[in-house]
Amino acid sequence: MHPVLQSVRNASVSAGGPHQQQPQQQQHGVSSVRRPPSPPRYPAQHAYPGAGATPTAGRGDFDGALDPDEGPVACGLAAGAGVDEVRMRERDAARRATVPEINLFKARRDVVPNGDYERDLMYHSGQAIDIDRQRVLTPEDFKGSEPAFTPAVNHMRAAELKRAAEQTAFGEELRNTCHQTRIRTALLRPEIGAGIYYLYDFVQTYLEHPDGRVKLNPQLVLVAQHAGNTMLAQRLWAIAEEKNAWLRDLIEMAYMIVNDPYLNTEQQLSAICTTVVELSMKYAKLAAKNGYPSMAQMAKAQEFFYRVMQAVLDLGVQVGVYNNRPARYRQKRMSEIPQMTDAEYMFGLTQALESRPPQGESFADEGPSESDDEDDFI
Protein backbone atom coordinates (compact mmCIF):
# COMPACT_ATOMS: atom_id res chain seq x y z
CA MET A 1 0.00 0.00 0.00
CA HIS A 2 1.24 3.50 -0.79
CA PRO A 3 2.51 5.47 2.25
CA VAL A 4 -0.08 8.24 1.70
CA LEU A 5 -2.93 5.73 1.64
CA GLN A 6 -1.43 4.02 4.68
CA SER A 7 -1.41 7.30 6.60
CA VAL A 8 -5.05 7.95 5.68
CA ARG A 9 -5.97 4.47 6.77
CA ASN A 10 -4.13 4.84 10.06
CA ALA A 11 -5.81 8.19 10.70
CA SER A 12 -9.26 6.71 10.04
CA VAL A 13 -8.56 3.77 12.32
CA SER A 14 -7.37 6.06 15.10
CA ALA A 15 -10.45 8.32 14.69
CA GLY A 16 -13.11 5.60 14.67
CA GLY A 17 -11.44 2.74 16.49
CA PRO A 18 -10.78 2.17 20.15
CA HIS A 19 -10.44 5.91 20.87
CA GLN A 20 -14.22 6.36 21.02
CA GLN A 21 -14.54 3.70 23.73
CA GLN A 22 -12.02 5.30 26.05
CA PRO A 23 -13.38 6.63 29.39
CA GLN A 24 -14.49 10.22 29.44
CA GLN A 25 -12.14 11.05 32.31
CA GLN A 26 -9.38 11.72 29.76
CA GLN A 27 -11.45 14.56 28.29
CA HIS A 28 -11.92 16.29 31.72
CA GLY A 29 -8.34 16.68 32.80
CA VAL A 30 -6.40 13.50 32.40
CA SER A 31 -3.56 14.23 30.01
CA SER A 32 -3.33 11.63 27.28
CA VAL A 33 0.04 10.13 26.49
CA ARG A 34 1.34 11.08 23.05
CA ARG A 35 1.95 7.93 21.08
CA PRO A 36 5.16 7.63 19.12
CA PRO A 37 4.89 6.93 15.40
CA SER A 38 4.48 3.35 14.32
CA PRO A 39 7.51 1.69 12.72
CA PRO A 40 7.53 1.36 8.92
CA ARG A 41 6.12 -1.86 7.54
CA TYR A 42 8.58 -1.95 4.68
CA PRO A 43 11.94 -0.25 4.10
CA ALA A 44 10.44 1.97 1.39
CA GLN A 45 7.60 3.18 3.64
CA HIS A 46 7.99 6.11 5.98
CA ALA A 47 6.66 6.20 9.53
CA TYR A 48 3.72 8.54 10.09
CA PRO A 49 2.46 9.84 13.43
CA GLY A 50 -1.04 9.07 14.56
CA ALA A 51 -0.86 5.43 13.61
CA GLY A 52 -3.31 2.94 14.98
CA ALA A 53 -0.71 1.03 16.96
CA THR A 54 -1.14 0.70 20.69
CA PRO A 55 1.90 0.25 22.90
CA THR A 56 1.99 -2.88 24.96
CA ALA A 57 2.43 -2.63 28.70
CA GLY A 58 6.02 -2.55 29.80
CA ARG A 59 7.45 -2.74 26.30
CA GLY A 60 8.25 -0.36 23.52
CA ASP A 61 7.03 -2.74 20.81
CA PHE A 62 3.97 -1.91 18.76
CA ASP A 63 1.46 -4.30 17.22
CA GLY A 64 0.58 -2.67 13.94
CA ALA A 65 -2.20 -5.08 12.85
CA LEU A 66 -0.40 -6.05 9.64
CA ASP A 67 -2.33 -7.61 6.79
CA PRO A 68 -0.44 -10.69 5.56
CA ASP A 69 -2.30 -10.66 2.22
CA GLU A 70 -0.96 -7.23 1.27
CA GLY A 71 2.16 -7.19 -0.84
CA PRO A 72 5.03 -4.76 -0.48
CA VAL A 73 4.43 -1.18 -1.43
CA ALA A 74 5.44 -0.07 -4.93
CA CYS A 75 7.49 2.99 -4.03
CA GLY A 76 11.09 3.92 -3.43
CA LEU A 77 13.54 1.11 -4.02
CA ALA A 78 10.70 -1.39 -4.35
CA ALA A 79 9.22 0.41 -7.37
CA GLY A 80 9.95 -1.31 -10.67
CA ALA A 81 11.60 -4.34 -9.08
CA GLY A 82 9.61 -6.72 -11.26
CA VAL A 83 10.28 -4.88 -14.53
CA ASP A 84 12.75 -6.59 -16.84
CA GLU A 85 15.43 -4.83 -18.84
CA VAL A 86 13.44 -4.72 -22.08
CA ARG A 87 10.46 -3.01 -20.45
CA MET A 88 12.72 -0.61 -18.63
CA ARG A 89 14.29 0.43 -21.94
CA GLU A 90 10.84 0.85 -23.49
CA ARG A 91 9.76 2.95 -20.53
CA ASP A 92 12.87 5.13 -20.79
CA ALA A 93 12.41 5.51 -24.55
CA ALA A 94 8.78 6.60 -24.11
CA ARG A 95 9.51 9.41 -21.67
CA ARG A 96 8.06 12.76 -22.58
CA ALA A 97 11.32 14.56 -21.89
CA THR A 98 13.27 12.62 -24.52
CA VAL A 99 13.82 14.13 -27.96
CA PRO A 100 11.94 11.94 -30.47
CA GLU A 101 13.80 10.59 -33.46
CA ILE A 102 12.46 11.78 -36.80
CA ASN A 103 12.90 10.01 -40.12
CA LEU A 104 11.93 12.46 -42.82
CA PHE A 105 11.35 9.64 -45.32
CA LYS A 106 9.08 7.45 -43.19
CA ALA A 107 7.55 9.70 -40.53
CA ARG A 108 3.77 9.86 -40.27
CA ARG A 109 1.78 12.80 -41.53
CA ASP A 110 0.93 13.93 -38.03
CA VAL A 111 4.66 14.14 -37.20
CA VAL A 112 5.90 15.67 -40.47
CA PRO A 113 2.93 17.17 -42.33
CA ASN A 114 5.00 18.02 -45.42
CA GLY A 115 4.75 16.17 -48.72
CA ASP A 116 7.27 13.72 -50.14
CA TYR A 117 9.10 16.23 -52.31
CA GLU A 118 9.15 18.81 -49.50
CA ARG A 119 10.74 16.18 -47.29
CA ASP A 120 13.45 15.75 -49.90
CA LEU A 121 14.16 19.48 -49.73
CA MET A 122 14.20 19.37 -45.94
CA TYR A 123 16.67 16.48 -45.99
CA HIS A 124 19.04 18.15 -48.45
CA SER A 125 18.77 21.47 -46.61
CA GLY A 126 19.57 19.82 -43.30
CA GLN A 127 22.61 18.12 -44.81
CA ALA A 128 23.85 21.42 -46.27
CA ILE A 129 23.35 23.54 -43.14
CA ASP A 130 26.41 24.23 -41.01
CA ILE A 131 25.54 25.38 -37.50
CA ASP A 132 27.56 26.13 -34.41
CA ARG A 133 26.98 23.17 -32.10
CA GLN A 134 28.65 24.92 -29.16
CA ARG A 135 26.56 28.07 -29.31
CA VAL A 136 24.74 29.09 -26.14
CA LEU A 137 21.69 31.31 -26.58
CA THR A 138 21.52 34.54 -24.61
CA PRO A 139 18.51 36.77 -23.80
CA GLU A 140 19.66 39.24 -26.46
CA ASP A 141 19.22 36.56 -29.13
CA PHE A 142 15.48 36.45 -28.49
CA LYS A 143 15.07 40.18 -29.13
CA GLY A 144 13.87 41.36 -32.51
CA SER A 145 11.20 43.22 -34.41
CA GLU A 146 9.51 39.97 -35.41
CA PRO A 147 9.11 37.32 -32.70
CA ALA A 148 9.14 34.51 -35.29
CA PHE A 149 12.35 35.75 -36.93
CA THR A 150 14.94 36.31 -34.22
CA PRO A 151 18.49 34.94 -34.08
CA ALA A 152 17.44 32.46 -31.39
CA VAL A 153 14.41 31.20 -33.32
CA ASN A 154 16.42 30.87 -36.52
CA HIS A 155 19.14 28.94 -34.71
CA MET A 156 16.59 26.60 -33.11
CA ARG A 157 14.87 25.90 -36.44
CA ALA A 158 18.20 25.25 -38.13
CA ALA A 159 19.23 22.92 -35.31
CA GLU A 160 15.96 20.97 -35.61
CA LEU A 161 16.38 20.66 -39.38
CA LYS A 162 19.99 19.55 -38.97
CA ARG A 163 19.07 16.98 -36.32
CA ALA A 164 16.22 15.56 -38.43
CA ALA A 165 18.50 15.21 -41.47
CA GLU A 166 21.23 13.47 -39.47
CA GLN A 167 18.73 11.14 -37.80
CA THR A 168 17.26 10.29 -41.21
CA ALA A 169 20.67 9.49 -42.65
CA PHE A 170 21.57 7.38 -39.62
CA GLY A 171 18.24 5.54 -39.75
CA GLU A 172 18.59 4.71 -43.45
CA GLU A 173 22.16 3.52 -42.96
CA LEU A 174 21.08 1.34 -40.04
CA ARG A 175 18.19 -0.03 -42.08
CA ASN A 176 20.47 -1.06 -44.93
CA THR A 177 22.92 -2.65 -42.51
CA CYS A 178 20.17 -4.66 -40.81
CA HIS A 179 18.76 -5.89 -44.12
CA GLN A 180 22.19 -6.91 -45.41
CA THR A 181 22.98 -8.72 -42.17
CA ARG A 182 19.76 -10.73 -42.30
CA ILE A 183 20.23 -11.61 -45.97
CA ARG A 184 23.87 -12.61 -45.36
CA THR A 185 22.77 -14.83 -42.47
CA ALA A 186 20.24 -16.58 -44.72
CA LEU A 187 22.81 -17.05 -47.49
CA LEU A 188 25.25 -18.68 -45.07
CA ARG A 189 22.75 -21.33 -44.03
CA PRO A 190 23.47 -24.73 -45.65
CA GLU A 191 19.76 -25.34 -46.28
CA ILE A 192 19.24 -22.30 -48.50
CA GLY A 193 20.34 -23.98 -51.75
CA ALA A 194 17.98 -26.94 -51.58
CA GLY A 195 15.13 -24.83 -50.22
CA ILE A 196 15.27 -22.16 -52.94
CA TYR A 197 15.63 -24.85 -55.62
CA TYR A 198 12.52 -26.64 -54.35
CA LEU A 199 10.58 -23.37 -54.07
CA TYR A 200 11.47 -22.29 -57.61
CA ASP A 201 10.76 -25.73 -59.09
CA PHE A 202 7.43 -25.96 -57.29
CA VAL A 203 6.32 -22.52 -58.54
CA GLN A 204 7.29 -23.37 -62.12
CA THR A 205 5.55 -26.76 -61.97
CA TYR A 206 2.46 -25.24 -60.45
CA LEU A 207 2.40 -22.61 -63.18
CA GLU A 208 3.09 -24.90 -66.16
CA HIS A 209 0.62 -27.65 -65.21
CA PRO A 210 -2.76 -26.07 -64.46
CA ASP A 211 -4.50 -29.45 -64.75
CA GLY A 212 -2.43 -30.97 -61.96
CA ARG A 213 -2.83 -28.19 -59.41
CA VAL A 214 -5.25 -30.27 -57.40
CA LYS A 215 -2.48 -32.75 -56.66
CA LEU A 216 -0.04 -29.94 -55.91
CA ASN A 217 -2.35 -28.16 -53.48
CA PRO A 218 -1.12 -30.15 -50.42
CA GLN A 219 2.43 -28.97 -51.14
CA LEU A 220 1.16 -25.43 -51.61
CA VAL A 221 -0.55 -25.62 -48.23
CA LEU A 222 2.70 -26.82 -46.63
CA VAL A 223 4.77 -24.04 -48.21
CA ALA A 224 2.23 -21.36 -47.30
CA GLN A 225 2.08 -22.69 -43.74
CA HIS A 226 5.84 -22.20 -43.39
CA ALA A 227 5.43 -18.62 -44.61
CA GLY A 228 3.08 -17.94 -41.67
CA ASN A 229 0.47 -15.22 -41.48
CA THR A 230 2.31 -12.81 -43.77
CA MET A 231 1.77 -11.08 -47.07
CA LEU A 232 4.04 -13.66 -48.72
CA ALA A 233 1.71 -16.48 -47.69
CA GLN A 234 -1.28 -14.61 -49.09
CA ARG A 235 0.56 -14.10 -52.38
CA LEU A 236 1.59 -17.76 -52.53
CA TRP A 237 -2.05 -18.84 -52.44
CA ALA A 238 -2.52 -17.00 -55.76
CA ILE A 239 0.98 -17.45 -57.19
CA ALA A 240 -0.38 -18.51 -60.60
CA GLU A 241 -2.27 -15.28 -61.18
CA GLU A 242 -0.87 -12.59 -63.43
CA LYS A 243 -0.86 -9.96 -60.68
CA ASN A 244 1.80 -11.97 -58.81
CA ALA A 245 4.24 -12.13 -61.73
CA TRP A 246 6.63 -9.86 -59.85
CA LEU A 247 6.86 -12.39 -57.01
CA ARG A 248 7.62 -15.21 -59.45
CA ASP A 249 10.38 -13.08 -60.98
CA LEU A 250 11.77 -12.35 -57.53
CA ILE A 251 11.84 -16.06 -56.64
CA GLU A 252 13.54 -16.85 -59.95
CA MET A 253 16.20 -14.19 -59.36
CA ALA A 254 16.84 -15.54 -55.85
CA TYR A 255 17.19 -19.06 -57.29
CA MET A 256 19.67 -17.93 -59.95
CA ILE A 257 21.79 -15.99 -57.44
CA VAL A 258 21.83 -18.59 -54.67
CA ASN A 259 22.59 -21.59 -56.90
CA ASP A 260 25.34 -19.89 -58.90
CA PRO A 261 28.50 -21.91 -58.14
CA TYR A 262 30.87 -19.08 -59.14
CA LEU A 263 29.63 -16.52 -56.60
CA ASN A 264 30.75 -16.27 -53.01
CA THR A 265 28.60 -14.96 -50.19
CA GLU A 266 29.52 -11.29 -50.60
CA GLN A 267 28.95 -11.42 -54.35
CA GLN A 268 25.57 -13.07 -53.79
CA LEU A 269 24.68 -10.34 -51.31
CA SER A 270 25.68 -7.65 -53.81
CA ALA A 271 23.60 -9.31 -56.53
CA ILE A 272 20.55 -9.49 -54.27
CA CYS A 273 20.91 -5.83 -53.24
CA THR A 274 21.23 -4.88 -56.92
CA THR A 275 18.06 -6.81 -57.70
CA VAL A 276 16.19 -5.09 -54.87
CA VAL A 277 17.31 -1.63 -55.99
CA GLU A 278 16.41 -2.29 -59.64
CA LEU A 279 12.96 -3.60 -58.75
CA SER A 280 12.31 -0.72 -56.35
CA MET A 281 13.32 1.86 -58.97
CA LYS A 282 11.16 0.21 -61.64
CA TYR A 283 8.00 -0.07 -59.58
CA ALA A 284 8.51 3.25 -57.78
CA LYS A 285 8.50 5.00 -61.17
CA LEU A 286 5.31 3.17 -62.09
CA ALA A 287 3.69 4.09 -58.77
CA ALA A 288 4.70 7.77 -58.92
CA LYS A 289 2.23 9.99 -60.71
CA ASN A 290 4.84 12.05 -62.53
CA GLY A 291 7.24 9.19 -63.24
CA TYR A 292 9.95 10.60 -60.97
CA PRO A 293 9.77 9.15 -57.44
CA SER A 294 11.03 11.11 -54.48
CA MET A 295 13.62 9.85 -52.01
CA ALA A 296 10.88 9.05 -49.52
CA GLN A 297 9.04 6.92 -52.09
CA MET A 298 12.27 5.16 -53.07
CA ALA A 299 13.04 4.41 -49.42
CA LYS A 300 9.58 2.91 -48.92
CA ALA A 301 9.88 0.82 -52.10
CA GLN A 302 13.31 -0.50 -51.09
CA GLU A 303 12.02 -1.34 -47.63
CA PHE A 304 9.17 -3.34 -49.18
CA PHE A 305 11.34 -5.36 -51.58
CA TYR A 306 14.00 -5.96 -48.92
CA ARG A 307 11.38 -7.45 -46.63
CA VAL A 308 9.95 -9.62 -49.42
CA MET A 309 13.42 -10.90 -50.35
CA GLN A 310 14.16 -11.71 -46.72
CA ALA A 311 10.85 -13.57 -46.44
CA VAL A 312 11.63 -15.60 -49.60
CA LEU A 313 15.10 -16.54 -48.33
CA ASP A 314 13.77 -17.45 -44.88
CA LEU A 315 11.09 -19.59 -46.52
CA GLY A 316 13.78 -21.33 -48.56
CA VAL A 317 15.75 -22.04 -45.38
CA GLN A 318 12.71 -23.52 -43.64
CA VAL A 319 11.83 -25.69 -46.63
CA GLY A 320 15.44 -26.82 -47.10
CA VAL A 321 15.64 -28.11 -43.53
CA TYR A 322 13.72 -31.20 -44.63
CA ASN A 323 16.64 -32.35 -46.80
CA ASN A 324 19.52 -31.41 -44.54
CA ARG A 325 18.28 -32.77 -41.23
CA PRO A 326 17.27 -36.40 -41.59
CA ALA A 327 16.36 -38.46 -38.56
CA ARG A 328 19.49 -40.00 -37.10
CA TYR A 329 19.62 -43.75 -36.66
CA ARG A 330 19.66 -44.71 -33.03
CA GLN A 331 21.07 -48.07 -32.06
CA LYS A 332 18.42 -49.88 -30.09
CA ARG A 333 19.19 -51.78 -26.95
CA MET A 334 18.75 -55.51 -26.75
CA SER A 335 15.89 -55.04 -24.32
CA GLU A 336 14.05 -52.83 -26.83
CA ILE A 337 14.28 -55.34 -29.71
CA PRO A 338 11.10 -57.46 -29.78
CA GLN A 339 11.86 -61.15 -29.27
CA MET A 340 10.24 -63.73 -31.57
CA THR A 341 8.43 -66.74 -30.26
CA ASP A 342 9.20 -70.25 -31.51
CA ALA A 343 6.05 -70.31 -33.62
CA GLU A 344 6.89 -66.97 -35.26
CA TYR A 345 10.46 -68.07 -35.93
CA MET A 346 9.42 -71.38 -37.52
CA PHE A 347 6.82 -69.58 -39.63
CA GLY A 348 9.45 -67.14 -40.87
CA LEU A 349 11.88 -69.99 -41.59
CA THR A 350 9.23 -71.82 -43.61
CA GLN A 351 8.50 -68.68 -45.61
CA ALA A 352 12.22 -68.21 -46.32
CA LEU A 353 12.60 -71.80 -47.52
CA GLU A 354 9.56 -71.62 -49.76
CA SER A 355 10.40 -68.27 -51.29
CA ARG A 356 14.09 -68.93 -52.06
CA PRO A 357 15.55 -72.13 -53.47
CA PRO A 358 18.59 -73.77 -51.84
CA GLN A 359 22.02 -72.51 -52.70
CA GLY A 360 22.94 -75.56 -54.82
CA GLU A 361 19.93 -75.20 -57.07
CA SER A 362 20.66 -71.57 -57.71
CA PHE A 363 23.93 -72.47 -59.41
CA ALA A 364 22.27 -75.23 -61.43
CA ASP A 365 19.66 -72.86 -62.80
CA GLU A 366 22.22 -70.43 -64.09
CA GLY A 367 23.04 -70.17 -67.77
CA PRO A 368 25.92 -71.96 -69.47
CA SER A 369 29.30 -71.33 -67.92
CA GLU A 370 32.48 -70.28 -69.65
CA SER A 371 33.68 -73.90 -69.87
CA ASP A 372 30.54 -74.96 -71.74
CA ASP A 373 31.03 -72.07 -74.11
CA GLU A 374 34.57 -73.16 -74.77
CA ASP A 375 33.43 -76.77 -75.44
CA ASP A 376 30.85 -75.57 -77.90
CA PHE A 377 33.42 -73.38 -79.57
CA ILE A 378 35.77 -76.33 -79.93
Swiss-Prot record:
<feature type="compositionally biased region" description="Acidic residues">
    <location>
        <begin position="363"/>
        <end position="378"/>
    </location>
</feature>
<feature type="modified residue" description="Phosphoserine; by host">
    <location>
        <position position="362"/>
    </location>
</feature>
<protein>
    <recommendedName>
        <fullName>Packaging protein 3</fullName>
    </recommendedName>
</protein>
<feature type="compositionally biased region" description="Low complexity">
    <location>
        <begin position="49"/>
        <end position="58"/>
    </location>
</feature>
<keyword id="KW-0426">Late protein</keyword>
<dbReference type="GO" id="GO:0019076">
    <property type="term" value="P:viral release from host cell"/>
</dbReference>
<dbReference type="InterPro" id="IPR037536">
    <property type="entry name" value="ADV_PKG3"/>
</dbReference>
<keyword id="KW-0597">Phosphoprotein</keyword>
<dbReference type="InterPro" id="IPR004292">
    <property type="entry name" value="L1-like"/>
</dbReference>
<dbReference type="Pfam" id="PF03052">
    <property type="entry name" value="Adeno_52K"/>
</dbReference>
<feature type="region of interest" description="Disordered">
    <location>
        <begin position="1"/>
        <end position="73"/>
    </location>
</feature>
<keyword id="KW-0231">Viral genome packaging</keyword>
<keyword id="KW-1048">Host nucleus</keyword>
<keyword id="KW-1188">Viral release from host cell</keyword>
<dbReference type="GO" id="GO:0019073">
    <property type="term" value="P:viral DNA genome packaging"/>
</dbReference>
<feature type="region of interest" description="Interaction with packaging protein 1">
    <location>
        <begin position="1"/>
        <end position="178"/>
    </location>
</feature>
<feature type="region of interest" description="Disordered">
    <location>
        <begin position="355"/>
        <end position="378"/>
    </location>
</feature>
<comment type="similarity">
    <text>Belongs to the adenoviridae packaging protein 3 family.</text>
</comment>
<feature type="compositionally biased region" description="Low complexity">
    <location>
        <begin position="16"/>
        <end position="35"/>
    </location>
</feature>
<comment type="subunit">
    <text>Part of the genome packaging complex composed of packaging proteins 1, 2 and 3; this complex specifically binds to the packaging sequence on the left end of viral genomic DNA and performs packaging of the viral genome. Interacts with hexon-linking protein IIIa; this interaction is required to promote correct genome packaging.</text>
</comment>
<comment type="function">
    <text>Involved in viral genome packaging through its interaction with packaging proteins 1 and 2. After proteolytic cleavage by adenovirus protease, L1 52/55k protein is removed from the capsid during viral maturation.</text>
</comment>
<dbReference type="GO" id="GO:0042025">
    <property type="term" value="C:host cell nucleus"/>
</dbReference>
